[in-house]
Amino acid sequence: MQNFKELGISDNTVQSLESMGFKEPTPIQKDSIPYALQGIDILGQAQTGTGKTGAFGIPLIEKVVGKQGVQSLILAPTRELAMQVAEQLREFSRGQGVQVVTVFGGMPIERQIKALKKGPQIVVGTPGRVIDHLNRRTLKTDGIHTLILDEADEMMNMGFIDDMRFIMDKIPAVQRQTMLFSATMPKAIQALVQQFMKSPKIIKTMNNEMSDPQIEEFYTIVKELEKFDTFTNFLDVHQPELAIVFGRTKRRVDELTSALISKGYKAEGLHGDITQAKRLEVLKKFKNDQINILVATDVAARGLDISGVSHVYNFDIPQDTESYTHRIGRTGRAGKEGIAVTFVNPIEMDYIRQIEDANGRKMSALRPPHRKEVLQAREDDIKEKVENWMSKESESRLKRISTELLNEYNDVDLVAALLQELVEANDEVEVQLTFEKPLSRKGRNGKPSGSRNRNSKRGNPKFDSKSKRSKGYSSKKKSTKKFDRKEKSSGGSRPMKGRTFADHQK
């Protein structure tokens, strides 16, 4: 395996990389860096987490060291990704006098103009704000020799394809080296490549990455009204270190986040209406383990590069294969195992088959956990928490109450009663989620079939026949009967085929 120095990287940059813990290049870095140093256009197909920032960032540092003025422009789909890329570039170039400036919406443009006037070598930004600066002439393009588009398919999905074309047209073509990285290559991106890139060197690592068995993919069949309870049962059994949960709409994210918090889970939500300050706060909590569940829409999660995500839950099934690929790519990184679970209504199974056909691999059916498994998982979790609680000093007033209770009740009965309340506390919390219609059944051409209900209000959960808002559905059980270990499970329903999580662990 070649090291960075053998690829042509300077001692100063190699020293910075080693201080960051990077001893050897990743496959995409090994394949990209030599061509990037030669000024050859690069078309890289790779998912987030493969080291693609280093693939374009490391050689870029080599090219801009000692230069004056804006030498390179990097486009990213989101503010978070722009900030992450900029931070990595600063680390790569530590001590070499390279200035990196970020420009994106949601922040005062005057501050960005002031930073641009200082002549940074590298500008990283989102398409909309970059165009603002181009129109104001606060971003000069005459000295730019390297244009990089990171996660180009995500920018396209967010409606930036025309912005990308506008920006590429503004950078002088004669001296420009273009590097475009994308997890997928839809036709619009291919057209962009054909129009603006010069015989690019194609570097592809996506197929190997996505066939990597580090990510185990499951689906579980569940009706909409039972989805939330099934989901929280999985959370109790899986005990994810960090989990990202995907909802289809902003309302779904808000309601799902509130429901999880009311059940005692450490969760926060992200969607397009969240302010930049709040987004940064939520992401900081997630990265620092203050919360372990992040609920997000596809758009809000784009560009996030968070390590350590153990589970991805598709609470709502994605409408296309590309979204599915990006969702599950948030887990199973850096050699760690990941689990992706997709909740699917019986009439949505066509979407599962479409994803399987497109990716060339099957998902495993996963039966929802039994009540006994859920309670056992909760009990194990409570035992672990009790061990932590016992290591802390209790307040004197609580010790006084404890003494009074122990004098009045048998100690075993007292502890058992308290544990029972802790284990079953979640069951007493009522939550409300607005009913969401399943996706339309797909026809033979892969598109939603039929137009019978296109203009019909039948089945629309939002309004009743008098156009009054529905109250949605509740996850609270109608029966308040306590669970009895000897009680037989309902034999009237046929068990769903597939493995339980306990089977999976075996």
UniProtKB/Swiss-Prot annotation:
Outcome after substituting residue 52 to A: Loss of RNA-dependent ATPase. Does not complement disruption mutant at 20 or 30 degrees Celsius, does not resotre biofilm formation
Q: Where is this region: Disordered?
A: 436-506
Phenotype upon knockout is: In strain S30, cold-sensitive; decreased growth at 30 degrees Celsius, no growth at 20 degrees Celsius. Reduced biofilm formation, increased hemolytic activity, increased stability of mRNAs of the agrBDCA operon. A double agrA-cshA mutation has wild-type biofilm and hemolytic activity (all phenotypes in strain S30).
Q: Where in the cell is it found?
A: Cytoplasm
According to its UniProt record, which reaction does this protein catalyse? ATP + H2O = ADP + phosphate + H(+)
Q: Which residues cross the membrane?
A: none
Q: Residue ranges for motif Q motif?
A: 2-30
Quick one: which residues bind ATP? Answer: 46-53
Matching entries from InterPro entries are given as: DEAD/DEAH_box_helicase_dom, DEAD_box_RNA_helicases, DEAD_helicase_CshA, Helicase_ATP-bd, Helicase_C-like, P-loop_NTPase, RNA-helicase_DEAD-box_CS, RNA_helicase_DEAD_Q_motif
Q: Mainly resides where?
A: cytoplasm
Q: Does the keyword Cytoplasm apply?
A: yes
**One Pfam family from the record:** DEAD
Q: Which UniProt keywords apply?
A: ATP-binding, Cytoplasm, Helicase, Hydrolase, Nucleotide-binding, RNA-binding, Stress response
Question: Biased-composition ranges for Basic residues?
Answer: 468-480
Q: Mention one GO biological process in which this protein takes part, according to its record.
A: response to cold
What's the Enzyme Commission number for this chain? Answer: 3.6.4.13
What disulfide bonds does the UniProt entry report for this chain? none
- Sequence ranges assigned to domain Helicase ATP-binding in this UniProt record: 33-203
Q: Where is this motif: DEAD box?
A: 150-153
**What are its GO cellular component terms?**
cytosol
Cite the GO molecular-function annotations of the record: ATP binding; ATP hydrolysis activity; RNA helicase activity; RNA strand annealing activity
Protein's job: A probable ATP-dependent RNA helicase with RNA-dependent ATPase activity. Involved in regulation of biofilm formation and hemolysis via its effects on stability of mRNA from the agrBDCA operon. Also involved in response to cold stress.
How the protein assembles, per its UniProt entry?
Answer: Homodimer. Component of a possible RNA degradosome complex composed of cshA, eno, pfkA, pnp, rnjA, rnjB, rnpA and rny. Interacts specifically with enolase, phosphofructokinase and RNases RnpA and Y.
Q: Which HAMAP family match?
A: DEAD_helicase_CshA (MF_01493)
Q: Which family does it belong to?
A: Belongs to the DEAD box helicase family. CshA subfamily.
Name listed for the protein in its UniProt record: DEAD-box ATP-dependent RNA helicase CshA
Q: Which organism is it from?
A: Staphylococcus aureus (strain NCTC 8325 / PS 47)
Lineage of the organism:
Bacteria, Bacillati, Bacillota, Bacilli, Bacillales
- Gene behind this protein: cshA
